[in-house]
Design a protein with these regions (language model features):
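Positively charged, small/polar-rich N-terminal and surface patches that mediate targeting and assembly
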Residues: 1-119
Length: 119
């Protein structure tokens, strides 16, 4: 089975996390920059429910972070997670392992057939 491995790290730990994943056998990845908050960050605050206020609070108080994503073989997930835990010991991070049931690649060309990479 394939797994969508998602590693959330603070911006300053991006290089460490990427190196750890590469050393553990990752072959490719993509990253998304975002600003994140944990429940402790807004503890004691009352967040207004209108979108402008909620977004404003995130912009003001959230921590810049990065989400590193990759599709990996299930057999590699534990060693990748262990490597991240070792290299980022004492740092804040989150690892999600999402099972993938199927991958379909759309070519965009009408002449080319779609291809099921994993099923």
């Amino acid at each position: 089975m394939k797994v969508h491995l998602r590693v959330f790290v603070e911006m300053e730990n991006l290089g460490k996390a990427m190196n750890a994943l590469t050393d553990a056998g990752i072959t490719g990845f993509y990253i998304l920059e975002y600003k994140g908050m944990s429940p402790d960050d807004w503890k004691g605050y009352s967040i207004k429910e209108d979108p402008k206020s909620a977004i404003g609070m995130v912009h003001k108080f959230a921590t810049p972070a990065v989400l590193i994503c990759s599709v990996v073989d299930e057999e590699l997930v534990d060693q990748m997670t262990d490597r991240i835990m070792k290299e980022l010991e004492g740092e804040r991070f989150t690892v999600l392992q999402v099972p993938i049931r199927k991958i379909v690649v759309k070519s965009g060309n009408k002449g080319n057939k779609d291809k099921t990479v994993f099923n």
